[in-house]
């Protein structure tokens, strides 16, 4: 079927595109002590007590974890996908079978973390607008990403 033929090529496009995004955003997603503290107190955020959360830059600890998890997943998908691409690569049957399991498990895991990400975005008022339009209000930035707000506004 066409999906079976196109899947590997779309995978290459996805991997190359993600590599470009990774190279662009990796420095903004380095974990800091404030991110670790934010993650340890994430329950407060979920409970709506987000006013006393540690100051965050452009991305919070949860967003940074999402970035690194997706980066690792795309890498594993690319490697396992290459092992599965029998039209161009000749791998032993055992490696192909293991790669199929790894590929499917990583894809399922990625779907799960994307679902959590979407749920978290819905949960945090103003986030859907930020993802849809690429902008946030000053008040939202000041409340959720104070360090970034100060960096951008100088206040």
Question: What residue spans do the PLM features occupy?
Answer:
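Membrane-embedded alpha-helical bundles that constitute the cytochrome b-like, heme-associated redox core
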Residues: 1-155
């Amino acid at each position: 079927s066409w999906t079976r033929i196109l899947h590997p090529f779309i995978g290459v496009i996805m991997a190359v595109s993600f590599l470009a995004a990774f190279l662009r955003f990796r420095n903004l997603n380095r974990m800091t002590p404030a991110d670790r503290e934010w993650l340890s107190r994430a329950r407060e955020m979920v409970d709506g007590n987000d006013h006393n959360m540690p100051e965050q830059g452009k991305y919070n600890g949860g967003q940074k974890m999402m970035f690194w998890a997706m980066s690792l997943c795309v890498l594993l998908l690319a490697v396992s996908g290459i092992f599965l691409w029998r039209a161009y690569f000749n791998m032993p049957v055992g490696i192909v079978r293991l790669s199929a399991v790894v590929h499917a498990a990583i894809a399922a895991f990625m779907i799960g973390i994307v679902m959590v990400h979407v749920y978290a975005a819905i949960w945090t008022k103003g986030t859907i607008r930020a993802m849809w339009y690429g902008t946030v209000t000053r008040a939202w930035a000041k409340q959720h990403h104070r360090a970034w707000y100060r960096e951008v506004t100088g206040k």
